Amino acid sequence: DMVLLIGHQQDVEKDFTYDTSKVEAFLVPAGTAVEVYATTLHYAPCHVKETGFQCVVVLPKGTNTELTFDKEDKGEDRLLTAKNKWLIAHEEAAIEGAFNGLKGKNIQII
């Protein structure tokens, strides 16, 4: 089993911030297939048992590979971390180089 933390892209504000109170958690039982649409905000799957979990993620070819161009440090480019990968982080996560645009509680699955 695992939990997916999901949000809607249209809830991202014009300044690229996102209110974490809009996140919904979904329990995905083992053996279940899930499609996450391109307009879905999501975080890495979360384990619900100390033994962890295994999952398969299928992405378009080239996704998460190194950028082949110089991005600008403004607008949506601030969120781009790799090909087809945008990241809005929480300040508490202290992810080097990430755009800290998650506002509100830093959600944890306990």
Question: How would you describe each model-predicted region?
Answer:
Residues D1-A30, A44-G52, V56-I110:
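Active-site region of the double-stranded beta-helix
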Residues V36:
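Aromatic-residue-lined binding/catalytic grooves and analogous aromatic/hydrophobic interfacial grooves
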